[in-house]
Amino acid sequence: MANNNNDLWSKYQSRIAGGWQLMSYDLYDATETQILAKPHGDQPLGRVLISPNGWLAAHIANPTRFGPLPSGKPWQTGDDAEVAHVARGISMYCGYLQLFEDGDGLYWETTVEISSDPNRKGGKEVRRVQLEERNGKGSMTLRPVKDMVMEVRSSCPSTQMLPLLSL
């Protein structure tokens, strides 16, 4: 995936910039035929905001884990287990994106400046981008280029998973 610094942002800016609401977040097997997990639940809460100059802020949460701590305390004084339960149901990152195209279609690279997972900071989040019109509204499907590792507790053998994020 060579981008040759041929950023296509100006060509697609009018179709991509704006606020996007998450419709689904599913983890598929490597063939993308079977849903293996829905890590943020059946109705995930998510927003992606993309500015006209390419600043991306993505926020995704499992609504069943996103609420007041059971103790009623604020995060700053809640116990570690309570805070971890909520925090592990949230995924956020932001940074500037660049948009490219290769033989497989559009993809963007976001240089991560801030993230809920400190391991992402300074790295690249690369997503395949599919733009469509559905019922007169714009639709965007994002697929990570790299496999994502998640712990899945089951008696089934380990399966490679690819998330499909539809916005």
Question: What are the language-model segments listed below?
Answer:
Residues 1-92, 99-167:
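Lipid interaction determinants
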